[in-house]
Structures are given as structure tokens and as C-alpha cells.
Amino acid sequence: MTAEHDSVTPAPADEGDIKGTVFNIQRYSIQDGPGIRTTVFLKGCPLRCAWCSNPESQNAKPEVAHRDSLCIRCGRCTDVCPQKAISTDENGIFIDRQLCKSCARCVDACPQGALKMYGVTMTAAEVFQQVRKDAEFYRGSGGGVTVSGGEPLFQPDFVAALLKLCRDNGIETCIETCGLAKTDALNKVLPYLSQVLFDIKLADSNDHLKWTQAPNEAIVRNLRIVAASGIPLIIRIPLIPGINDTEDELRKIAEIVSENVEKPVKVNLLPYHKFGMGKYQMLDREYQLGELDTQTKDQLQEAKQLIESYGFECDIEG
């Protein structure tokens, strides 16, 4: 019997109808937890990491992006925009984001796909109908559903409703979190989780504020809460050249984890990359770290060995 014909335990109407803002549902993911997974990416994040590879996730509301290389200057977008927020010239598309209401009329009118909407409103039940399509793959591979972002805890009611639907129907669940959230939001989601992927970016709170625009005291507090819950936990460290990949900084991060999480715990290192740079241009934003180079294999191995010296199992992702 296929997953499409499996019986489904429905959510209570009020839970299934809870709405969230989603910008991508990625099937067959193998990077966001064990096994084959579907990753649900949500809009909205309390951090503004200088290296963020998903700038389209930061704003909580839907937003229009543009790809100038596809624009043929037909003017259809300018004609249909009720806010007169779009103009075009020989250099491409200009969107006045103070005027734009993200109504998506320009996106629908564009014959070339030069305009794209990041973010759509969906109910928890609607998202579940999408992710349950691959239930047999989850069961066969030890996978499941991961909710990422942005920050999942930015939409706690929606995430709790979606995860409960998954768990009630035998699908393993996971979130990827930056850790910055109200305790109430975290506690609302924890009962429906099979695993947590928890980012630790910088040890010093002032440095954290400088590079992410938020201090890290609440993040460390929430790390303790997740660790105490007994839910399987993986620590993820995005390695940013010259910012947090030095020996001194990695030792400080390892010490924070040691002080707040009982071993054994796994640490995943995420090498720096520039895959998101093009999206900054599409959203009329500036990427601050374009001059940085990715780490060498030797540098990554040194970082891995340092983390392992603290008694952690450590992998390099990618």
C-alpha cells in the first residue's frame, strides 16, 4: 500500500487550520537530519547573520524577488502593479519595497519567470498533505520531516500543529533552530519532536551581537532546556572564516556545549559557502562577506579534531 492510500489521523479542526508562512518544501533532503527527509522552510528569523545563505527566510512576510537576467522589459509587471512599486530600465527591475504589498500580481503576469514570490500562507493540514507523500521513504530510511527556516520557533503554533500531525501519523520529526526564542515557544514545540538540530554560532555574546544582531544568552538558556528534555540533540556549528573558525573560538564553543549538554552528543560542522549570494541580489540586499574564502580540507579536519578532543562525536557536513 502506498503512502498516498495510508489512513491518516486528522488534526482537530482548530489545529489543522493554523496558518504559517512557508517559502519552500524540499523533498528528498539528506542534510537536515537522519535518513531521507522533507524539509519545510518557514519565513521569519530573529537573527540577521552576516553569512546567512537564506536571506529570503529572514523577513516574516512574503516578498518578491527579481532575476534581471530573465527580464525582457515587456512592462507587464509595471502594468499590473496596483501600488506602482515596480519599474524597469536597461539595468533590470527595480522594486520599491516601501510600496510593495507582495500581492504577487507581478509574479503571475511575468511571462519569463523573472519575478518570484518567497513565501506563501498555508495551513498545517495543507503542509502535512505535502510531506506525507513520502512517508514510505521516511520509514524505509529512518527519515522524517524537518522544519527549518528562518527560525521554526518564530511560528510556534503552526509548527506545533504540523509536528503533532506528523507524530500522530507515525512520521519522525525534527527542527533546525538558531535557539533564539521565547521559552514558551520552545516548550510548545518540544513535545512533538523526535530530534533537534541546534545551531551554536559564537561563544561571546558581544561577538554574537556584532555578527548576528542579537546576543546569545537566551540561546544558551534554550540549549539547556533542550538538553534537559532528553530529546536527541545534534549541535551544528557554521564555520565562518576568521569569525568563528579559529582555535580559540572553537574551544570556547566546545566549552559552552560541554557545560550545558551531557555527553555523548554529536557536533556537525558546516563549512562556509557562498551559495546564497545570488538571492541577496534578487532581494536588493548586500552580502557582507563576499570576500571570504571557503575552508580547505586540512582546516576542516583540524576543526573536527579540536571538537573531538572535547569528547564529542564530530562530522563535517557537505
What annotation goes with each model-predicted range?
Residues 66-68, 209-215, 284-292:
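Short glycine-enriched, charge-decorated loop/helix-capping segments at active-site entrances
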Residues 125-282:
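Conserved AdoMet/S-adenosylmethionine-binding subsite of the radical SAM
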Residues 66-72, 119-134:
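Extended, non-globular alpha-helical segments
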Residues 1-34, 227, 239-318:
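Auxiliary Fe-S-binding modules of radical SAM enzymes
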Residues 50-57, 76-95, 105-121:
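Iron-sulfur cluster-binding cysteine motifs and their immediate structural context
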Residues 1-74, 78, 87-88:
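Flexible, acidic/Gly-rich N-terminal and inter-domain linker regions that tether
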